[in-house]
Amino acid sequence: MQAAGFDVLCNPFGTLYNPLSIVACLERAVENRLMEDNDLMRHDGLWHSWLHHSRFSHSDKDVCLARCNEAVGQTYSFLKRKPLLIVTLGTAWVYYYQGRVVANCHKVPPRQFERRRLNVGEIVSAWQPLMERLACAVLFTVSPIRHLADGAHGNQLSKATLLLAVDALTEVLPQAGYFDSYELLTDEMRDYRFYARDMCHPSEVAVDIVWERFREAYMSADTREQVRQREKEFRQSQHRTIVNA
């Protein structure tokens, strides 16, 4: 979307996968509630935040804290503009550390975590009060990327839980919508040529098709034409001129 000319704030806390961690980050951003020293933990010589991706980690606690709070402030400012908030849910499996849901395990030994799959009610109960506070529309998607650590059946149960939770939210909250990227890849593009070499992630062709369907669903003809032009200009800007000596 950035290449198409849209003003986008993408994954300000880093890539998040489970519904509860996304809620925790958005709640903090809505309140502009900054992180404090006791929100960080130290492991393997680095300071980390349980809410943030490892790219925020640093050997200096103050640097780590500043990076994390910059993300909180950026998200707060962006939400004040009442944007379209697109939320992609990846998995219903969550990790708990000392009773607290974490977004990233930061290579802490697995035995220190409790891991379990959320149920539909838990996801809805976490998201509904947050969405009632958000002054913007929320468009949910469910990631078609397969998480196969628990096998194919475990992945299906996780995705089904997310789909049912999103369906429940869109039934009761008028500002909530759903874009069917999951169904596009798993139903319409069942052929493995639409998957990358790892057989879990979508291929570039699949991503292009999903993006095309998104444009058709949510953009006017004029906007789609502007997007095509912006994308063309972006591709041209990425080409390097080769000069023969």
Task: Identify the function of each model-found stretch.
Residues 1-245:
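Extracellular glycan-modifying ectodomains
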